[in-house]
């Protein structure tokens, strides 16, 4: 399982790199660097095997953005984007009969390295874009919460109540889409949605472990703001 996940992770890294390298060989060259910040909310769950009855756990995200734009190939504006984010994720177990639940929040530092393709205006106006690439994460802390009359002994699976994560390192794949509005002297304003699929299990998935699968997945909504540190002197950029 671990070797298969690493192969998938390496494949996405390679495809993202090759895609940007190929586009950088031809097209309308530019060299622009922007820096900014973003923040928003996450709706997260965990892919458990054996499965648990889950709802979505809401968390927060915030971080910094570094973006290098290198090329416009045909109509696609090609860039590399690296981020450092604080990210809350985890899961929430729910009951049908009541609003009682158990939740575990896991706080990570996440570092996505993304290929970014955009279509539209770069300096003044709107553009749509997509991002795709690998992401790694490092667990900082975790906490859990019970509400109402939640009773551990009444659950089929109870391992997760008394055990923290076995592994602090996480990796997976991120895919997103958004809109950006740019204005001269003001910068770039973004709104974006993303999906993260974790390839790594945070509980021991060996024959000695309880869960065969315990990988994160998250839907993220965020807004961001960037300013240009340097721009290309290219008359074709609009």
Regions flagged by a language model, labelled:
Residues 37-41, 62-70, 86, 113-117, ...:
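Residues on the lipid-exposed face of transmembrane beta-strands in outer-membrane beta-barrel proteins
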Residues 24-26, 45, 67-72, 116-121, ...:
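Outer-membrane beta-barrel proteins
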Residues 46-53, 88-107, 140-169, 203-219, ...:
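Flexible, solvent-exposed loop segments that connect beta-strands
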Residues 67-148:
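Gram-negative (and chloroplast) outer-membrane scaffold detector with strong preference
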Residues 31-33, 56-62, 105-111, 126, ...:
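Residues that define the transmembrane beta-barrel architecture of outer-membrane proteins
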Residues 25-67, 226-228, 238:
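Short glycine/proline- and aromatic-enriched beta-strand/turn motifs that initiate or cap beta-hairpins
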């Amino acid at each position: 399982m671990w070797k298969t996940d690493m192969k998938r992770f390496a494949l996405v890294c390679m495809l993202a790199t090759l895609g940007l390298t190929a586009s950088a060989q031809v097209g309308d060259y530019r060299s622009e660097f922007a820096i900014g910040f973003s923040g928003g909310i996450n709706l997260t769950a965990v892919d458990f095997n054996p499965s648990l009855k889950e709802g979505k756990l809401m968390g927060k995200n915030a971080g910094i953005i570094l973006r290098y734009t290198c090329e416009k190939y045909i109509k696609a504006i090609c860039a590399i984007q690296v981020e450092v984010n604080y990210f809350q994720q985890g899961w929430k177990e729910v009951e049908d009969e009541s609003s009682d639940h158990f939740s575990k929040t896991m706080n990570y530092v996440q570092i996505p390295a993304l290929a970014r393709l955009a279509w539209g205006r770069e300096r003044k106006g709107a553009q749509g874009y997509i991002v795709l690439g690998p992401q790694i994460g490092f667990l900082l802390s975790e906490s859990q919460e019970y509400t109402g009359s939640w009773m551990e002994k009444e659950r089929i699976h109870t391992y997760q109540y008394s055990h923290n994560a076995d592994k602090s390192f996480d990796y997976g794949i991120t895919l997103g889409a958004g809109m950006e509005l740019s204005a001269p002297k003001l910068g770039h304003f973004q709104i974006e949605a993303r999906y993260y699929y974790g390839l790594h299990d945070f509980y021991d998935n060996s024959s000695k472990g309880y869960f065969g699968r315990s990988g994160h997945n998250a839907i993220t909504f965020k807004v961001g703001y960037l300013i240009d540190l340097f721009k290309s002197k290219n008359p074709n950029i609009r």
